[in-house]
Amino acid sequence: MSASIADNVAEAQLQAEVLTKALPHMQRYDDAIVVVKYGGHAMGNDELARHFAQDIVLLEQSGVNPVVVHGGGPQIGAMLEKLGIKSEFAAGLRITDKATIEIVEMVLAGSINKQIVGFINEAGGKAIGLCGKDGNMVRARKATRTIVDPQSHIEEVVDLGFVGEPDTVDTMVLDQILGRELIPVLAPVASAVDGGTYNVNADTFAGAIAGALGAKRLLLLTDVPGVLDKNKQLIPRLTIDECRALIADGTVSGGMIPKVETCIYALEKGVEGVVIMDGKLPHSVLLELLTDHGIGTLITR
């Protein structure tokens, strides 16, 4: 046998071994619903976007029912800047007036959503782009936040404008799609309970969708490895009580707090497990779901 043939055989054997090791994980997720919140740096990199799309298609063709929820903060910011509209934030959320919500809806439900649909279809899948307004899937109520004035130390209620939080989720549309070789891709734009449109934080939106569907897993793709301890080391597993303790002692702080709170919310709504993970790693979704140890922080009840 020549060296080149031997190398080809060895490579084929390695690929077969990888598939064999992935088999029990595929069986575990067979016919299960997995909600993936897609955002962060990975969305702005075409190569990582293609890897993500391949992961989602492979999951669907392996018997999993994936649901993709995407963000788009940087893209919204870029469009607002292009139009000469200044972005303002409070408590980590974009203040959204009437002019801004129209642009947010256009960017999220139009441009970004269709780009992701295109990548998935290019990878061999059959993706359908939707938003929370379709079929009244997600109805939202007005979100409010309180901030503490640094000088007076008095709490103030901030009006975020057309920013909402999920109030009800109707899964009828998704129930008709899942299990039919179709992959729903959802933009976090929702109908207001009192009429109109609300922009919803993508993590919060994904948590509400996962809870309503009774998902086996909710994956939150971020720009960090997961939840880190005080030495900046990854914590591989946490419970709800441990998460609350880490928030209370300041280990979990800043932008990680709302992500962990979303995890707790989803778990209390019935999701089996939630993972905060690094979406910048190529094929991060497969590495998390189809390997023995995963790559992020798994949070369970």
Curated annotation (Swiss-Prot):
It catalyses: N-acetyl-L-glutamate + ATP = N-acetyl-L-glutamyl 5-phosphate + ADP. One of its GO terms (cellular component) is cytoplasm. Keywords: Amino-acid biosynthesis, Arginine biosynthesis, ATP-binding, Cytoplasm, Kinase, Nucleotide-binding, Transferase. CDD domains: AAK_NAGK-C. Disulfide bonds: none annotated. Substrate binds at residues 72-73, 94, 199. It is found in: Cytoplasm. GO terms for molecular function: acetylglutamate kinase activity; ATP binding. The record marks 37, 259 as: Transition state stabilizer. Its EC number is 2.7.2.8. Catalyzes the ATP-dependent phosphorylation of N-acetyl-L-glutamate. PANTHER family: N-ACETYLGLUTAMATE SYNTHASE, N-ACETYLGLUTAMATE SYNTHASE, MITOCHONDRIAL. This is Acetylglutamate kinase. It comes from Azorhizobium caulinodans (strain ATCC 43989 / DSM 5975 / JCM 20966 / LMG 6465 / NBRC 14845 / NCIMB 13405 / ORS 571).
